C-alpha cells in the first residue's frame, strides 16, 4: 500500500494538506488562515471567535433542512516531539509521512494525527457533495494540547447545535461518553551556584529510548518515566556517597501531557568515587531494564565524563532530588463503579524538569474522573514540593465530563455501529482530558460522544495511525449523520 491508495481518499488528501501546515500548540495562525480560506473557497459560512476557534457551517442536504443541527469538533494544534538526532523545525517544516504496513507514520517526528485526522474528516465532509445530512457545524479549536485554550475561551452561543461528536479519541470501536478532569502543578526551586570542591570529577548521565506516551491514556501501561528513573539514581547514589554528590543540572521532558521519554543529568563526585559510580550506574541500568523488560525494550543508558561547571547549592539540590523521589507518579486509584472498575480514576505524571542558571522548573500533571479527588491529588503533589522548599503554583483546572443518562446521540452512535459492523462498540470513559468537559460547562444541554480512528504512541515520534480504521470511522460518522437527518 502506498499513500496514493489510502482510503477514504478525500480524508487522506485533506490530512496531507494539513500536515504541510506548521501548527504547534499556541502557534496555530497558519492553520486558522487555512481553515478560513477553505470555508470561503467552498462558499460556506465561516466564523473565527476571539480565541481563534474556527466554525464552518454547512447547510443541510435538500429535504433535511429541519433536522437537528449536529456539531463535529476537533482541535487544530499538535504535540511537537522528535527524535534527538532529527533536524526538524515544527514552526517551518512539513510533516513527512510514510506507510508501514497498515500504519501511517512520520519520519522521526510526531505524526500530527492527534488531532489532524479529526480535522481532515471534518474538512472531507465539508468538501463532499454526496453525503446525506442535516445542518452541520464543523468546529476547530485551538491549543487543546497545552491548556485547552480554545475550549476555555469559547463563549456560549458560538455553537448552536444540540449534539456534538468529538473526533479526538484514539481507539476505533470505542465510543467515549465521559472523560477525566485535569490540572497542572508547577514547582520552582531557586538556588545559587558555587564551584565544586577540589578533587571532584564531573559526569553526564543520560537515558533515552523510552516509549513515553500520553500521560492520561497511556498512564496505566507500565511505561517508565525518565524523570523518576534519573531522580531515583541520584537519590540512591547520594545516599551511598554519604551526601557528597553535587548536582549541576537535570533536564527531562518537554510537554505537560506526555510521559517523559528521555533525560540527562550532570553531576560531580569525588575522584575517588568515580569508578564506583560507573559500576553503580551499570548495575542500576540492569535492574531498571529488568523491571521494564516487557514494556520498555529499547532503553538506552549512557554515562560519560564532562567538563567542570558550577554546581547547585547543596541544600537545594538535595531537597529537589528528595522531592522527585517522593512525589506520586502513575495510576493511583481505579474507578469504583463496577462496570468500569478497570479504568484509572486518578493519576499523576511528573512531566518535565528544566534547569536554568539559578532555578529548576518542574511541571506535574494530575488527572481524575472525580473532581474532589483531582483536588486532593493536586494538593498531594503540591505538598511534596512545598515541604522541599519549592515555590509552587497550580494551573487552571479543566472539568471532567460526566456520562449523560439516556443520551440520544449515544444510542444513535451504537445503533449505527451495529448496523455497519454487526457488533456492539464499547461505550466507556477515558482517563484523559477532552474538550467535552469544558463544553459540558458552557453548554449543559449538549449531548456528546467522542470517537476516532486508532492511534498508537501519540505525543511521541512513534505516533502511528491505523489506516483501515479511518474508513471505518468515516462510514460510522456518515451513518450517524444520515440517522440524525432522518
Spans of features found by a protein language model:
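Acidic/His- and Gly-rich active-site-bordering loop/insert found
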Residues: 2-102
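Zn-dependent metallopeptidase/amidohydrolase metal-coordination segment
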Residues: 7-11, 345-360, 421-479
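His/Asp/Glu-rich mid-to-C-terminal helical/loop segments that flank catalytic regions of hydrolases
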Residues: 36, 157, 222-240, 271-274, ...
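Active-site metal-coordination/substrate-binding segment of hydrolases
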Residues: 64-146, 151-162, 202, 317, ...
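Active-site-adjacent substrate-binding region
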Residues: 225-227, 232-250, 403-446
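Substrate-recognition/cap regions that form aromatic- and gly/pro-loop-enriched pockets
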Residues: 343-432
Amino acid at each position: 500500500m502506498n499513500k496514493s491508495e489510502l482510503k477514504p481518499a478525500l480524508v487522506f488528501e485533506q490530512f496531507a494538506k494539513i500536515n504541510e501546515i506548521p501548527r504547534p500548540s499556541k502557534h496555530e495562525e497558519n492553520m486558522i488562515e487555512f481553515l478560513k480560506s477553505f470555508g470561503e473557497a467552498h462558499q460556506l459560512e465561516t466564523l473565527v471567535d476571539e480565541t481563534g476557534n474556527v466554525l464552518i457551517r454547512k447547510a443541510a442536504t435538500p429535504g433535511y433542512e429541519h433536522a437537528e443541527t449536529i456539531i463535529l469538533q476537533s482541535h487544530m494544534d499538535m504535540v511537537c516531539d522528535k527524535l534527538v538526532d532529527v533536524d526538524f523545525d515544527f514552526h517551518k517544516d512539513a510533516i513527512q509521512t510514510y506507510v508501514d504496513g497498515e500504519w501511517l507514520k512520520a519520519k522521526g517526528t510526531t505524526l500530527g494525527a492527534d488531532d489532524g485526522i479529526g480535522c481532515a474528516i471534518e474538512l472531507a465532509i465539508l468538501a463532499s457533495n454526496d453525503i446525506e445530512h442535516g445542518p452541520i457545524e464543523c468546529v476547530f479549536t485551538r491549543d487543546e494540547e497545552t491548556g485547552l485554550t480554545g475550549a476555555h475561551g469559547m463563549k456560549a452561543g458560538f455553537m448552536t447545535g444540540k449534539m456534538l461528536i468529538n473526533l479526538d479519541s484514539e481507539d476505533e470501536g470505542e465510543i467515549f461518553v465521559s472523560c477525566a478532569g485535569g490540572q497542572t502543578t508547577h514547582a520552582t526551586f531557586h538556588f545559587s551556584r558555587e564551584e565544586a570542591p577540589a578533587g571532584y570529577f564531573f559526569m553526564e548521565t543520560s537515558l533515552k529510548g523510552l516509549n513515553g506516551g500520553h500521560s492520561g491514556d497511556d498512564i496505566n501501561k507500565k511505561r517508565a518515566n525518565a524523570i523518576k528513573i534519573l531522580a531515583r539514581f541520584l537519590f540512591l547514589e547520594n545516599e551511598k556517597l554519604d551526601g557528597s554528590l553535587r548536582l549541576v543540572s537535570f533536564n527531562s521532558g518537554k510537554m505537560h501531557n506526555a510521559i517523559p521519554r528521555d533525560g540527562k543529568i550532570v553531576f560531580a563526585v569525588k575522584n575517588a568515587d568515580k569508578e564506583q559510580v560507573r559500576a553503580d550506574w551499570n548495575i542500576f541500568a540492569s535492574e531498571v531494564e529488568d523491571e521494564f523488560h516487557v514494556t520498555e525494550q529499547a532503553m538506552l543508558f549512557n554515562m560519560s565524563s564532562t567538563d567542570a561547571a558550577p554546581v547547585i547549592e547543596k541544600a537545594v539540590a538535595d531537597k529537589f532530588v528528595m522531592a522527585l523521589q517522593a512525589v506520586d507518579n502513575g495510576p493511583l486509584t481505579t474507578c469504583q463503579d463496577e462496570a468500569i472498575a478497570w479504568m484509572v480514576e486518578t493519576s499523576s505524571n511528573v512531566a518535565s524538569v528544566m534547569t536554568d542558571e539559578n532555578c529548576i522548573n518542574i511541571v506535574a500533571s494530575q488527572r481524575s474522573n472525580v473532581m474532589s479527588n483531582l483536588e486532593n491529588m493536586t494538593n498531594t503533589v503540591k505538598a511534596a514540593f512545598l515541604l522541599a522548599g519549592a515555590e509552587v503554583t497550580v494551573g487552571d483546572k479543566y472539568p471532567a465530563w460526566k456520562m449523560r443518562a439516556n443520551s440520544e446521540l449515544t444510542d444513535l452512535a451504537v445503533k449505527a455501529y451495529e448496523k455497519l459492523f454487526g457488533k456492539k462498540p464499547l461505550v466507556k470513559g477515558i482517563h484523559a482530558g477532552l474538550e467535552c468537559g469544558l463544553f459540558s460547562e458552557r453548554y449543559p444541554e449538549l449531548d456528546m460522544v467522542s470517537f476516532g480512528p486508532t492511534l498508537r504512541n501519540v505525543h511521541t515520534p512513534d505516533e502511528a495511525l491505523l489506516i483501515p480504521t479511518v474508513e471505518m470511522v468515516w462510514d460510522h460518522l456518515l451513518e450517524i449523520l444520515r440517522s440524525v437527518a432522518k
